[in-house]
């Protein structure tokens, strides 16, 4: 699960995650997708680029 807000500036970013993930999986470049979604702050961009989905990895240990 991606955090709801950017850790640095507090901008809501979670509503863009599904669109970002779908478009990058389809082969579009990360920078182009983030530009198109209007994610211009470097702190918010880092949230997308560095995020790793761990829900599937951690769910067996509940």
Curated annotation (Swiss-Prot):
Which sites bind Zn(2+)?
Answer: 6, 9, 43-44
TM segment ranges: none
Q: Quote the EC number.
A: 2.7.7.6
Q: List the cofactors.
A: Zn(2+)
Q: Which Pfam families match?
A: RNA_pol_N
Q: Where does it sit, as one GO cellular component term?
A: cytoplasm
GO biological process terms, alphabetically, are: DNA-templated transcription
The places in or outside the cell where this protein is found are: Cytoplasm
What GO annotations for molecular function exist for this entry? DNA binding; DNA-directed RNA polymerase activity; zinc ion binding
What InterPro entries does the record point to? RNA_pol_su_RPB10 (IPR023580), RNA_pol_suN_Zn-BS (IPR020789), RPABC5/Rpb10 (IPR000268)
PROSITE patterns to which the protein is assigned, alphabetical:
RNA_POL_N_8KD
Alphabetized, the UniProt keywords read:
Cytoplasm, DNA-directed RNA polymerase, Metal-binding, Nucleotidyltransferase, Transcription, Transferase, Zinc
- The parts of the chain that form a coiled coil are none
Span of the secretion signal? none
Keyword Transferase among record annotations = yes
Q: What NCBIfam families does this protein's entry cite?
A: PRK04016.1
Outline the subunit composition. Answer: Part of the RNA polymerase complex.
Q: Which family does it belong to?
A: Belongs to the archaeal Rpo10/eukaryotic RPB10 RNA polymerase subunit family.
Entry protein name: DNA-directed RNA polymerase subunit Rpo10
What is the species of this protein? Methanosarcina acetivorans (strain ATCC 35395 / DSM 2834 / JCM 12185 / C2A)
**Which lineage ranks, top first, belong to the organism behind this chain?**
Archaea, Methanobacteriati, Methanobacteriota, Stenosarchaea group, Methanomicrobia
Gene designation per UniProt: rpo10
């Amino acid at each position: 699960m991606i955090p709801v807000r950017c850790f640095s500036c507090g901008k809501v970013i979670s509503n863009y995650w599904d669109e970002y993930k779908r478009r990058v999986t389809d082969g579009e470049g990360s920078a182009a997708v983030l530009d198109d979604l209007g994610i211009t702050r470097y702190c918010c961009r880092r949230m997308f680029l560095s995020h790793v989905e761990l829900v599937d990895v951690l769910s067996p240990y509940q």
